[in-house]
A protein has these predicted regions:
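Conserved active-site motif detector
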Residues: 2-131
Length: 131
C-alpha cells in the first residue's frame, strides 16, 4: 500500500483513549505487515507479544539499504521495519517532527513471515478533544 500525503490525511480520525476527559485526536496513517520479521527478534519474543501492544517507531535516515527506513521495536527489542513500499509518508512526517504511534493489530502463526504480524500507525494531530 503506497500512501502519499493527501491520501494519508484523508484517512480515519479516532480517539486515543476513551476513558480520558481530554484526548488528542489520532489519524490512522497506515496498516502494514512487518518487514524483516525472520531476521530480528520476533521469533524469540512471539509468545510474549499481544494484539494491541504498543510498538516504538525509530527513524533511521542513515540506513544504508533505505534512507526512508523506519524501524519497529517492541519493548526495546528490534522486530523489523515498516515495509519500504509503505514508509515514505511516515518518514516524511517523522522528519518534520510529527509524533507517530504504532500498535500490533494482528499476530498469526504462518510460514510466510510477511503474514506473521501487522501493525497500525497513527499520527497525533495535536488537537485536544473534549468529551
Amino acid at each position: 500500500m503506497r500512501l502519499d500525503l493527501i491520501a494519508a490525511l484523508s484517512l480515519v480520525v479516532f480517539f486515543a483513549s476513551p476513558a480520558s476527559a481530554d484526548t488528542n485526536a489520532k489519524l490512522l496513517l497506515q496498516n502494514s505487515p512487518l518487514a524483516g520479521f525472520r531476521y530480528y527478534e520476533g521469533k524469540q519474543l512471539w509468545s510474549e507479544m499481544k494484539v494491541g501492544d504498543t510498538l516504538q517507531l525509530v527513524r533511521e535516515p542513515d540506513n544504508s539499504h533505505d534512507p526512508k527506513a523506519v524501524r519497529i521495536d517492541w519493548q526495546g527489542h528490534k522486530l523489523g521495519y515498516v515495509p519500504r513500499t509503505d514508509n515514505k509518508a511516515l518518514a516524511r512526517f517523522m522528519d518534520q517532527g510529527s509524533k507517530a504511534e504504532a500498535r500490533i493489530t494482528r499476530l498469526k502463526k504462518s510460514r510466510n513471515p510477511w503474514q506473521r504480524m501487522e501493525f497500525e500507525v497513527y499520527l497525533d494531530i495535536g488537537q485536544p478533544i473534549q468529551k
